């Protein structure tokens, strides 16, 4: 079974559940783990971007966790995780800096991502679009780290 939560960057660089997701009060404890990890890594990415963060028009983080259950159990144990980053920026020259900030957040700075890596593999996909409509230029990168 796959559990998933999506967050979007809002005013004040706050990460909130994306449209269609319930607020935090409606999340199960296991979904709260995904929410907390997405919010923590998002905060680290914004901090690492510095002045470039102002040129990021939107940042959506989707965190998925594969849950393994045994028998008739209602809850299970996470076995692996996938983070998906959908970024729209105003300047195509910022693509490499954005990718690097995501790499650093996953590989070095985010304590919650490091915690998830103790549970199982953590992979991430990066989709970066530039232009006002988000359709000019597109990069995809998939990284799996343990």
Spans of features found by a protein language model:
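Extended beta-strand/beta-hairpin segments
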Residues: 1-36, 43-146
């Amino acid at each position: 079974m796959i559990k998933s939560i999506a967050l979007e960057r809002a005013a004040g660089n706050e990460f909130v559940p994306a449209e269609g997701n319930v607020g935090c009060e409606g999340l199960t404890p296991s979904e709260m783990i995904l929410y907390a990890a997405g919010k923590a890594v998002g905060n680290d990415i914004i901090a690492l971007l510095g002045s470039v963060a102002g040129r990021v028009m939107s940042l959506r983080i989707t965190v998925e966790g594969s849950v393994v259950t045994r028998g008739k159990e209602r809850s299970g144990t996470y076995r692996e995780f996938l983070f998906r980053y959908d970024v729209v920026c105003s300047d195509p020259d910022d693509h490499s800096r954005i990718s690097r900030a995501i790499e650093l957040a996953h590989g070095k700075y985010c304590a919650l991502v490091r915690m998830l890596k103790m549970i199982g593999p953590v992979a991430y996909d990066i989709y970066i679009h530039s232009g006002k409509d988000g359709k000019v230029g597109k990069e995809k990168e998939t990284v799996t780290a343990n």
